[in-house]
Amino acid sequence: MMNKIKGYKAYNNMNDRFNNSYEIGKEYYIEGPIKFKERGFHFCKNLEDVFRYYNGFDENTVICEVEGFGEIDTYNDEYYGYYDMYASSNIKIIKVLSREEIIDIIINRNIDSIKRFISGFKLTEEEELIILNKFKEEIIEKYIDYYQKNDEKAFTKKRSW
């Protein structure tokens, strides 16, 4: 039985950086040796990590749930704390995630994942409140102020409480 790894991949209007188009429910294959950062269908196990490679502030960015299989190369960047990133010879596009699904997934992650997500994905005011209500730590408020509201002084402000 073939190992399948579920993960997430970002596209620009369902096109990759080479302008290849992808469709929901279809499987794709690439020949040749698979190596992360070189060749293969790249995806991340953790949703927040896709924003290392795609701009989540761009309204054309689409986030998909995918399955990678076939030949798989795993990459971990311990220095920056990115783990379980893959390149695979085969990929299936399961579905496009709605904003609600993205928030539902990310809200159940740890605080470091939330910080990474806030720094890479444009949130609505309602989504900011959902995150602030779940994570009441001051650092989350600072991340939202800095990355979402462009407040360059967010990390130097003294809070009154």
Q: Model-found features: residue ranges?
A:
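Short, glycine-biased loop/turn motifs at secondary-structure junctions and
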Residues: 1-161
